[in-house]
Curated annotation (Swiss-Prot):
This is Succinate--CoA ligase [ADP-forming] subunit beta. It catalyses: succinate + ATP + CoA = succinyl-CoA + ADP + phosphate; GTP + succinate + CoA = succinyl-CoA + GDP + phosphate. Heterotetramer of two alpha and two beta subunits. Pathway: Carbohydrate metabolism; tricarboxylic acid cycle; succinate from succinyl-CoA (ligase route): step 1/1. The gene is sucC. It comes from Neisseria gonorrhoeae (strain NCCP11945). Binds 1 Mg(2+) ion per subunit. One of its GO terms (biological process) is tricarboxylic acid cycle. Its EC number is 6.2.1.5. Residues 9-245 form the ATP-grasp domain. NCBIfam families: PRK00696.1 (NF001913), sucCoAbeta (TIGR01016).
Length: 388
């Protein structure tokens, strides 16, 4: 689950991080009032969406009057912002954050943290190349990124934070200020189950003080059950409608841009299924894992989700019977196809527990379901059916 910039800044401020002041506005009048309240020579109006690249997409504007603040806010709110991180439809802008005047600054830095799967620990990344995409820095000048891995038994040590401060070129009081900031960020990361933390840029102001000009936070969705206050911050308008509906039925669904719908049990098998579809010249329309406890209702909902995507021209169902029996899945597929008007080719591959019985149920159903003998055969049949 992602947080908006204003939510991220509020959370980080509660842990003692110095953040750029800002006021949330839901319309032009509120933006104009926010400009007056901030009282600077200029302000920055930022569209609040769950996507990076807002500046290049026109979602971040500098304004020098209350009238301009109102004009920019009205031009953004109610529209969809398309960036390099969104699909062609973009993300809806429901509000803007009017931020205080902080520029010019001495320099812009970068500070971020993720859970490093290779070390299974929180790893901080810092760079003197703030204000630009960290992926670009990693690709072009990786030597300018400093990494610190935190031992979960002892937490982030002050000496580690000071070492990063030295590498960033900070001096005197800035070193202790940065150490406090980084320690607060680690505490926030652990206590709120962050999956991602990023401040870009972390500005060094003309007076030498540090300030988080932007804030990006991603929460581990698996931990939301123990984070009720964080869960309340979820903005469902920023999520794909089908993905949102899938989560209500405990279906793992990710929309893609192909034309072959996939229904699979198991994340690994789902990824392998998408790979072999690509290998055979097809394009998967989605990732959909119905899980080990697939039932008729879940299969029906999975079918509905897949077919709501009008670009889907065929469906490949790939089930490995382990925990779940193939005959039960076959019965659910038959019931789902009868309940829903499925007018695209459907190829079914069943393997494992009661696979033969499952295939018999499908063959005797009288429905236009194509059985496949193995994953390779299934991929070839669905690609051929879609291209026919």
């Amino acid at each position: 689950m992602n947080l908006h910039e204003y939510q991220a800044k509020e959370l980080l401020a509660s842990y003692g991080l110095p953040v750029q002041g800002g006021i949330l506005a839901h319309n032009g009048e509120e933006a104009a009032a926010a400009y007056d309240k901030l009282g600077g020579k200029f302000a920055v109006v930022k569209a609040q969406v769950h996507a990076g690249g807002r500046g290049k997409a026109g979602g971040v504007k500098v304004v020098k009057s209350r009238e301009k603040a109102k004009e920019v806010a009205e031009s953004l709110i109610g529209t969809n912002l398309v960036t390099y991180q969104t699909d062609a439809n973009g993300q809806p802008v429901n509000s803007v954050l009017v931020c205080e005047d902080m520029y010019p600054v001495q320099t812009e830095l970068y500070l971020g943290a993720v859970v490093d799967r290779s070390t299974r620990r929180v790893t901080f990344m810092a760079s003197t190349e703030g204000g630009v995409e960290i992926e670009k820095v990693a690709a072009e000048t990786p030597e300018k990124i400093f990494k610190v891995t935190v031992d979960p038994l002892v937490g982030l040590q002050p000496c580690q934070a000071r070492e990063v401060a030295f590498q960033l070129g900070l001096k005197d009081k800035q070193i202790n200020e940065f150490a406090k900031l980084m320690t607060g960020a680690y505490k926030a990361f652990v206590e709120n189950d962050f999956a991602l933390f990023e401040v870009n840029p972390l500005a060094v102001r003309e007076n030498g003080a540090l300030a988080c000009v932007d804030g990006k936070i991603g929460i581990d969705s698996n931990a939301l059950y123990r984070l009720p206050k964080i869960a309340e911050l979820r903005d469902k308008s920023q999520e794909n409608e089908r993905e949102l509906k899938a989560s209500e039925f405990d279906l793992n669904y990710v929309a893609l841009e192909g034309n072959i719908g996939c229904m699979v049990n198991g994340a690994g098998l789902a990824m392998a299924t998408m790979d072999i579809i690509k290998l055979k010249g097809g394009q998967p329309a989605n990732f959909l894992d119905v899980g080990g406890g697939a039932t008729k209702d879940r299969v029906v909902e999975a079918f509905k989700l897949i077919l709501e995507d009008k670009s889907v021209k065929g469906v490949l169902i790939n089930i490995f019977g382990g925990i779940v029996r193939c005959d039960m899945i076959a019965e659910a597929i038959v019931a789902a196809v009868k309940e829903i008007n499925v007018n695209v080719p459907v190829v079914v591959r069943l393997e494992g527990n009661n696979a033969e019985l499952g295939a018999k149920i499908l063959n005797e159903s009288g429905l236009k379901l194509t059985s496949a003998d193995g994953l390779n055969d299934a991929a070839e049949k669905i690609v051929a059916a879609v291209n026919a």
